[in-house]
Amino acid sequence: MRAVFVLIVLFASIAGAGLARAGDSMSYREMADTMQMDDTARFGKALFDRLEWRDGDTGEGRGVWDGQAWYGGDYDKLWVKSEGKYVSTGHDKGLRDADVELLWSRVISRWWNLQVGGRQDFGPGQSRTWVSVGVEGLAPQWFETEATFYASDEGRTAARLKAQYDLLLTQRLVLQPFAEANLYGHSDRQHQIGSGLSDLEVSIRLRYELRREFAPYIGVVWLRRFGGTADFVRAAGGAASDVELAVGLRVWL
């Protein structure tokens, strides 16, 4: 539980500092009015931040995706997000940890958006449906941050925390550190998930932007499972931690 507390405090501090900074500056609407921006225009974007193949210590090759698309105006947008993996070999073979979210997003400050909607999980066992509430935006030092809370009609709760940063080494070469943590309020034996901090992924990727919308990359990913989740994985013959090499594409339209 100490690890859970540290993670929550860390992400809360980042988000809180970002909101405080935003509160001391001009609001998004005031900025748009001052610059005479057309805030009624509608536009959209689709992005796969991570579309990759991984191979690690366990010898289990896997395809992984993390993408999102949105459409709307300056203040309100409709978002679709999805992430997951397909394991090609080993005890975990098949679709794993896959989900799709449909969200309404509203600007609440210069740097932050409130997002409300639902999430549908896919994969082995019973599918789960969640209601989601979260924030997404830029923390100090331009860290892209997401913090989302989930609740299901079965009384289950969960949280997902994400942070990433793009460091420009040159005009085309970009280094991107990334971290994601998943937490659950109750154990779920059917899905091999323990309560508390379930898993933590920390990675770093180096991409080369042939064009801004098309960038191949290589990376290293460290994945660690904790508590009951680690016990479930070990009991099934897997490893609680793994280091993987990643090769993939970042593409957007």
Give each language-model segment a name.
Residues A20-K93, S105-R106, L245:
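Outer-membrane beta-barrel initiation region
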Residues R42-G44, G61-W65, G94-V100, S127-V131, ...:
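Residues that define the transmembrane beta-barrel architecture of outer-membrane proteins
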Residues R50, V80-G84, V116-Q120, A147-A151, ...:
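Transmembrane beta-barrel strands of outer-membrane/channel proteins
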Residues Y71-G73, R106, G137, A151, ...:
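Residue-level signature of outer-membrane beta-barrel architecture
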Residues Y75-V80, R110-L114, Q141-T145, T170-L175, ...:
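Repeated loop/turn-to-beta-strand initiation elements of outer-membrane beta-barrel proteins
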Residues E83-G90, Q120, S132, A147-F149, ...:
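Extracellular loop and loop/strand-boundary signature of outer-membrane beta-barrel proteins
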Residues S127-R189:
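Detector for outer-membrane/organellar transmembrane beta-barrel domains
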Residues I204-E209, A240-L253:
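Outer-membrane beta-barrel "beta-signal"
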